[in-house]
UniProtKB/Swiss-Prot annotation:
This is Tripeptidyl-peptidase 2. GO terms for biological process: proteolysis. One of its GO terms (molecular function) is mRNA binding. The lineage of its organism: Eukaryota, Viridiplantae, Streptophyta, Embryophyta, Tracheophyta. Transmembrane segments: none annotated. Its EC number is 3.4.14.10.
């Protein structure tokens, strides 16, 4: 998975740029020893196979084409070569930091300096652009650079629906509870102030938060060390004064001082800064909505960050003003107000990525023009699609709102340097809406192709897989290598970065449209504390291309050339400079390297042509295949015979095209060409009208060699051949190698690698293979070498099966690998030496590579144990060679299904959530409740929706997990995460959006699974048997066997024993895990910690119904009590239980409850359970009026409970140890324990009431008397229970507090809080803050108050 498609240097700021980097771990692994960025994600490589005739590649048309060259312009212009090396001058060095020559920008601007992007508006769909960053304030002609800054995800939303009014001195109480002073100069005719608050770290990136935490902890540690020193001084002084005292009071005083010191030391160890709270205030000044922010908590200085000192902001688009939270963070933000002041969006970036992207596209540096972006005259809007709550992951909500904003602002271009893998190309809700934006609103959409190279089929969505979006690959020139990457010796020629994703798509489309420079030193946000940074990736090539297209837009607008995404795309593709003469390299580079000047010449010449694009859909004749966008033959079977394909060619006009003036007269005569007539057969001419035309293609790959082959069928306008290909049908043929031997193996000897070289092999994986063991040996080189190893297999309706490794060889050596494969599918093996690895060495790397296929086939890949005692029979075979059958099955997770307890549909406010078509987006909120009996790591899963963002017809999915205190523990989207939760009850809310209410209605009972990890000690290892009765009888254990090729071996998988099942698992839950069958061969065991074969399969066990307890009714002697007596007991207990049914909120309820109590007491005098229930109800009764009388009532009720109990008899009974076999004695003991608990609870409640009365009284004499009663009551309590436990600890805390032993009180209270058997109680934390303030630890009090907003927020945040 990736989403940000850029890489950065190995610095703290760089880490922020790539918080959830492009693909897996390659960002971290692919950093070149001397090249800052060489961080790549998934692997993909340039093709080395060369087959097929000449292609109408970029810039080289089969007929007259606009002036172009077959190779990119020399990147060495302005440099000097010495001894075969590459040297930079100072100007060319600066140029290399922001590459533009490579795409012809220098030539274009030299001819048209006024067409530098002026008049072009670009929407940046990314992580949020910093409006304070260098080069992003104005355009080259003095206009504002950034016209709007929008958080489309909602991650910065603050609920400001609470309205307050100022008091007489001009102060209000903010949402955080802080008293805020209003600036008297602020106009507010209504005098209504909307207030909200937010933890400021929720607005910051992890990198910025980490820096702030370090800075703030330094200051906090200083204060804490002072407090520790003072506490230690007090303890030492006490020890000197009372060193030999054995007095109990002196001992307790000493313990108190020791507790204070211990508490401070533990605070330092457990310090976790969750950040201060900022208060947000919004109001309407009579003209517009305004926002002010109070950041005193962040400043750390009472004189800074005050609300009244803040310069009010309004929606950014109105005044284009931004704020800075504090000097410490240097983080800028903007504000947008929605829903009549009830919602304020505080917009910050979630990564430096977007600012860097925006700088490449359009930065303007008047003092250093060489560092300008590609289109310094262009203007921008920032659409934040990366959600800060999710680390910077894009969300469906963010993507759709961004499209809405782009249309609303009438943008000319969109740049999106984000993406994900997909199982279906050109499919999904966002793809549909993006196509509408392009086709109807004429916005040019440009996106990154992905960083998953060097293997083929690695382009991601949406850039590399969507017909309406221009996907851009990443190119590195010699100048970029020498300057931006600072390599010791630049390569002689430019090349595609090793990690740049390659095509084709699963449905045969080319995947990569064009290439552009994929690295730059560009602006980054101010909070990084630097002005610019080096990043590379297709994230950088996309804005480079987008900036180049913005120049075209600027020129076309200025010269009155009709602007259309169709025309622009044809211009840039047909004039791109070829990077390689090898046809197969088109899958790597697309049509070539963008050339702005030539594209403009093309656009000028094509200005009178119809604004039309040809859409292609292809079907194989005789097969009911889905509509394809290319022909893709991948496998030995498809290459053994000739195939015929029907191509449907449909002209696509913009939606506002006139029927009579454009559609009816449209007619084009096209001559068809193929790049290799020996393989591809086509008609010679076709006539195309508005309703389209079909023609057939015959592909005969029978006689071609093994490997990769790429061909094209393209049409040329007979009347205007200079236009180049009007449409192209990409044809990719992969003919794999068939292996032999036992086991099947492929040996590649003496492969020679230099920097950037890629070797590809395509292998027909034998049926029956399930894993591969690889040996890679290197030799004959000097400096360390880094290699990317990738394998890819394509499965229908599934993301590509991909394995990858990044390996560094410090010296000649051998490495072993093993990974799973799917039998019967073609496997691509890519071995690539990283583009900058060994670049200064003249010695090639010699590589020997051996790949051996192994496999154990089973008759059922997914095993489901149904919860019964019966085992499951499995039949295993080895089809390739002898293998050792060693089954291992482990159940390590439990999945519990839940249905929503509540579902709610609501129409969202139109300010952000109305589509350009006018359709209103609707939200479905599903509420689930679940309970954990013990702490656990859990992950919510929604099988219908998870793991699909672009290839999903539902717009958005977002969940959050909270407790009864409204504390949010976790949130997530399409890729749920594990979160560690304590014991307790939790609420999960799932938020789904769409404009079709009928679709949402179908999801109202959507099943969600809570997946819980088992602790390692609780993993369940299943047993195997050679007999069907083995699990029951306990014999016939199966351990291992040798499989002879073709001969089946059967065994049974037994269910887990009842004793091994996890506790507190609900029936209907499913234990899940994995099972493996084979073992890797001995040569690779040294490298593999786990010697089991890497091919694993799913296994599950359904939790059966609970055991029926037949012992419940045993021991009930019919002769002990008569039926009449038992009936009386039942009636009595029901009446007592009924007491809890009164809420006592109304006078009628109170009088009814009192009457019931009055009737029950005489009927059941001295019956302790009744009196205990009465006490419980009185304690729970609301007391807003007379608190003193209420406490007196509690004391009276508690005394009645105490008086009802014979304490001597109780003590005697509890001291006796009953006979464990005497059932009656055991029941009596349990009854006595219940009575003891009722006594203790009465004493506890009485003590709390006495303390409360004491706090309400002011008369000293009564206070002294109350102290005696309190102490007497407390001493009675500790006779029966440990008063320091969680249940009774509050009274101990009050007692220690009354005695002035605040340290001891704090210790007891902290122990209560840390007991995770219950969820946090606000009253305990409030008491904790009171104790800390009484001690005088200001810094600890401030810390705890900040945590209160985390544990007990006033409300759940908006979605």
């Amino acid at each position: 998975m990736w989403h940000l498609r850029g890489r950065s240097s190995v610095t703290a700021a760089a880490a922020a740029a790539l918080h959830k980097p492009v693909a897996h771990l390659r960002l971290l692994l692919a950093v070149s020893a001397w090249s800052v960025p060489a961080a790549a994600s998934n692997v993909a490589a340039a093709s080395t196979t060369t087959r097929g005739g000449p292609s109408p590649s970029a810039g080289v048309a089969p007929r007259a084409m606009p002036s172009s060259s077959s190779s990119p312009p020399s990147a060495a212009e302005g440099t000097t070569a010495a001894a075969g090396g590459f040297r930079l001058t100072e100007p060319s060095f600066l140029e290399s930091l922001m590459p533009k020559k490579e795409i012809g920008v220098d030539r274009f601007l030299a001819a048209h300096p006024e067409y530098d992007g002026r008049g072009a508006l670009i929407a940046i769909f990314d992580s949020g652009v910093d409006p304070a960053a260098a080069g992003l304030q104005t355009t080259s002609d003095g206009k504002p650079k950034i016209l709007d800054v929008i958080d489309c995800t909602g991650s910065g939303d603050v609920d400001t629906s609470k309205v307050v009014k100022a008091d007489d001195d001009g102060s209000i109480v903010g949402a955080s509870g802080t008293h805020l002073t209003i600036n008297p100069s602020w106009k507010n005719p209504s005098q209504e102030w909307h207030v909200g608050c937010k933890l400021v770290y929720e607005l910051f990136t992890d990198t910025l938060t980490s820096r702030l935490k370090k800075e703030r902890k330094k200051k906090w540690d200083e204060h804490n060390q002072e407090a520790i020193s003072e506490a230690l001084k007090q303890l030492n002084e006490f020890e000197k004064k009372h060193s030999k005292s054995d007095d109990a009071k002196q001992k307790m005083a000493r313990e108190d001082l020791q507790s204070r010191l211990e508490y401070l030391r533990k605070q330092a160890e457990g310090y976790d800064d969750r950040g201060p709270v900022i208060d947000i205030v919004a109001w309407h000044d009579g003209d517009v909505w305004r926002v002010a922010v109070d950041t005193q908590g962040l400043e750390g200085n009472k004189n800074c960050g005050k609300l009244a000192d803040f310069v009010p902001l309004t929606n950014y688009r109105l005044e284009r003003k931004f704020g800075i939270f504090s000097k410490l963070d240097a983080c800028s933000f903007v504000a947008n107000i929605y829903d009549d002041g009830n919602l304020v969006s505080i917009v910050t970036d979630c990564s430096p990525h977007a600012t860097h992207v925006a700088g490449i596209a359009a930065a303007f540096h008047p003092d250093e023009p060489l560092l300008n972006g590609v289109a310094p005259g262009a203007q921008l809007i920032s659409c934040k699609i990366g959600d800060t709550r999710l680390g910077s992951m894009e969300t469906g909500t963010g993507l759709v709102r961004a499209l809405i904003a782009a249309v609303e602002h009438k943008c000319d271009l969109i740049n999106m340097s984000y993406g994900e893998p997909t199982l279906l190309p050109d499919y999904g809700r966002f793809i549909d809406l993006a196509s509408e934006v392009v086709d109807k609103h004429r916005i040019i959409f440009i996106s990154s192709a992905g960083n998953n190279g060097p293997a083929l089929n690695t382009v991601g969505a949406p850039g590399g897989t969507s017909s309406s979006i221009i996907g851009v690959g990443a190119y590195v020139s010699p100048a970029m290598a020498a300057g931006a990457h600072c390599v010791v010796q630049a390569p002689a020629e430019g090349m595609e970065y090793t990690w740049s994703s390659r095509g084709p798509t699963a449905d045969g489309d080319l995947g990569v449209s064009i290439s552009a420079p994929g690295g730059a030193v560009a602006p980054v946000p101010t909070w990084t504390l630097q002005s610019r940074m080096l990043m590379n990736g297709t994230s950088m090539s996309s804005p480079s291309a987008c900036g180049g297209v913005a120049l075209l837009v600027s020129a076309m607008k200025a010269e009155g050339i009709p602007l259309s995404p169709y025309t622009v795309r044809k211009a840039i593709e047909n004039t791109a400079a070829s990077i390689s003469d090898v046809p197969e390299e088109k899958l790597t580079t697309g049509h070539g390297l963008l050339q702005v000047d030539r594209a403009f010449e093309y656009a000028q010449q094509a200005k009178e042509l119809p604004l039309v694009s040809y859409r292609i859909s292809i079907n194989q004749v005789g097969k009911p295949t889905s509509k394809l966008r290319g022909i893709y033959l991948r496998g030995s079977n498809t290459c053994r015979q000739t195939s015929e394909w029907t191509v449907q060619l449909d002209p696509k006009f913009h939606e506002d095209a006139s029927n009579m003036e454009q559609l009816v007269p449209f007619e084009e005569c096209l001559q068809l060409h193929s790049t290799d007539s020996s393989v591809i057969k086509i008609p010679e001419y076709i006539m195309v009208t508005n309703n389209g035309r079909t023609f057939n293609i015959v592909v005969n790959p029978v006689n071609i060699s093994s490997g990769l082959h790429y061909y094209e069928v393209y049409g040329i306008d007979c009347k205007a051949p200079w236009r180049g290909p009007i449409f192209r049908v990409p044809i990719t043929v992969i003919k794999p190698i068939a292996l032999s031997g036992e086991p099947p193996a492929l040996t590649l000897s003496n492969l020679s690698f230099k920097s950037g070289h890629i070797e590809r092999r395509f292998i027909n994986v034998p049926i029956g293979a399930s894993w591969v063991e690889v040996t890679m040996r290197t030799s004959a080189f000097d400096t360390p070498r880094r290699f990317f190893l990738d394998t890819v297999q394509i499965c229908p309706l599934k993301r590509p099966i991909k394995w990858e490794a990044v390996v560094t060889f410090s010296s000649p050596s051998l490495k072993n690998f093993s990974f799973p494969v799917e039998g019967g599918l073609t496997l691509e093996l890519s071995i690539a030496q990283f583009w900058s690895s060994g670049i200064a060495s003249h010695e090639p790397t010699c590589v020997d590579f051996e790949i051996v296929f192994h496999g154990i086939s089973v008759d059922q890949k997914i095993i489901g144990l149904d919860g019964s005692e019966a085992p499951v029979r499995v039949v295993a075979r080895s089809l390739l060679a002898s293998e050792r059958l060693v089954p291992v099955a482990t159940l390590n997770k439990v999945k519990t299904p839940y249905r929503p307890v509540e579902s709610n549909l609501c129409s969202l406010p139109p300010s952000r959530d109305r589509l350009p078509s006018g359709k209103q987006i609707i939200a479905l909120t599903l509420t689930y409740k679940f309970k954990l009996e013990d702490g656990a790591e859990i992950k919510p899963r929604v099988p219908l929706l998870n793991n699909r963002i672009y290839d999903n017809k539902f717009e958005s999915q977002y969940y959050r997990i909270s407790d009864s205190n409204k504390c949010v523990y976790s949130s997530g989207d399409v890729y749920p995460n594990y979160v560690k939760l304590s014991k307790g009850e939790y609420t999960l809310q799932l938020y789904i959006r769409h404009d079709n209410v009928q679709l949402l209605e179908k999801l109202k009972q959507l099943v969600l699974f809570i997946e819980r990890k088992l602790e390692k000690k609780d993993f369940i290892q299943l047993s195997f048997y050679s007999e069907p009765d083995g699990p029951t009888v306990g014999n016939g254990t199966f351990k291992s066997s040798i499989l002879v090729p073709g001969e089946p071996e059967a065994f049974y998988v037994g269910p887990p024993s009842r004793e091994k099942l996890p506790k507190n698992v609900l029936p209907g839950s499913v234990l899940v895990g994995s099972i493996t069958y084979g073992a890797v061969s001995s040569f690779s065991k040294k490298d593999d910690q786990n010697q089991h074969a890497p091919a694993s399969y799913s296994i599950s066990y359904l939790i059966p119904p609970s055991k029926v307890d037949n012992d419940k009714e045993k021991g009930v002697s019919s002769g002990r009590k008569s039926i009449s007596e038992r009936l009386d007991d039942e009636v009595r207990d029901t009446k007592i239980k009924f007491l809890s049914g009164f809420n006592q909120e109304t006078e009628d309820d109170k009088s009814s409850w009192t009457a019931l109590v009055a009737s029950l007491k005489p009927e059941y005098p001295k019956y302790t359970p009744l009196l205990a229930k009465i006490l419980e109800c009185i304690v729970q009764k609301a007391t807003s009026d007379d608190k003193f009388s209420h406490q007196k009532e509690i004391i009276a009720a508690a005394d009645e409970v105490v008086d009802s109990i014979d304490k001597e008899d109780l003590a005697k009974s509890l001291s006796l140890k009953p006979d464990p076999e005497d059932e009656e004695a055991q029941k009596n003991k349990k009854k006595m324990e219940e009575t003891r608990d009722q006594l203790a609870d009465a004493l506890y409640q009485k003590g709390l009431a006495l303390a409360e009365i004491e706090s309400l009284k002011t008369d000293e004499s009564t206070e002294a008397s109350a102290k005696d009663v309190f102490e007497e009551n407390y001493k009675e309590l500790i006779k029966w229970v440990d008063a320091k436990t969680t249940k009774y600890g509050s009274l101990t805390v009050l007692r220690e507090r009354r005695c002035g032993r605040l340290g001891t009180a704090l210790k007891v209270l902290n122990d209560m809080i840390q007991d995770d058997s219950e969820q946090p109680k606000k009253r305990l934390y409030d008491l904790k803050i009171q104790l800390i303030e009484e001690i005088g630890w200001v810094h600890v009090s401030a810390y705890e108050k900040q945590w209160m907003h985390v544990r007990f927020p006033p409300s759940l945040p908006p979605f």
